[in-house]
Amino acid sequence: MGGGVGMDEAGETLAGFVAARMGEAVLERSVRPIIAGIYTADPSVLATDTVAPGLRAETARHGSLAAAVAVRLAAAGSRRTPEACVQGGMFVLVDALKAAIEEAGGTVLTRTGAFSLRRAASGWTLECGPTKPGPTPGAEPVPAGPGVNVTTERLVLACSASAALRLLTQARIPGLVPDVSVPEGAPIARLTLAVHAPELDDAPVSQGLLVAPAPADERPVAAKALSHLNIKWPWLADQLPPHTHLLRLSYGRLGEAEPAVTIDGALRDIRTLTGVTIAAEAVTDRLLARWNGTLPPLPPEYRARVRALEEQVRPLGGVALTGAWVAGTGIASVVTHARAGAKGLL
């Protein structure tokens, strides 16, 4: 098979690319279940270059999708392990970044949002002010007080699509037309349970598992994924009493109603997926978080509109866009894109 297979229009979607390179069996039995569980979308509507930036080019260079993936895995293997995590939780990373910025002479304003944006004589002026949380973790914060103006020569809009597009529209920049409509993402719910269950000490499903999509009346469970968090993140095990485990169940699929999540239903799903029966009284704590719309399916035409917007913004000077809505989902994609954008402003 030549390196050019899957590089045409059909390969712009992840499903088309995988099917062209490896066939329908690999798509149906491996890629589709994984993508549905992680991205809450079908690979037939996701842009290959957004989900896996650079993979098509690497496939063409190596002449094989398997070879391109192997090269990526080999490169990643030298700097990560299956247990890679931030010991203590992600807030530790945020605190470290804040400390590094302040040590370098910068200022970090927390619980502060950007209300408006306009051009200034020597850069950009943001109206910033206090905010309070929105209705869900993924929603924009809500203004909670008067704003103040902050002027800067260089500005990186590292935020959600809705916030960035709102600010760019308010700026009323001649020739700038933010013609980007973000597709609606699935309603996602994540229920984390702390349970006393010695039967889970042997980690019957290791770090966790994904549930392949199926018609609602054919699904063995309502959950789309289960993560055994104290196995996935070993530092958590040191924080828990003996025989206590943290299990996270994910619910919600694209095109379906907001999932109704209950403790009894979650325990039934756990029994089906792990073979372990956990009584309701063995649940010692719980946390339900909803992330509605935070994982929109990004098709090839969306990627084209975002690239067009970036081309409109670039000549303005002193401003860059980044975030998952521009760079693609995943920390690695966003970090690489954000670094390039910030470097371009120096």
PLM regions and their residue ranges:
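A short helix-to-beta-strand connector/capping loop
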Residues: 101-107, 121, 315-318
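Mid-domain catalytic core of redox enzymes
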Residues: 115-132, 136-260
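Active-site/ligand-binding neighborhood in enzyme catalytic cores
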Residues: 2-115
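Generic alpha-helical secondary structure
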Residues: 90, 94, 164, 259-267
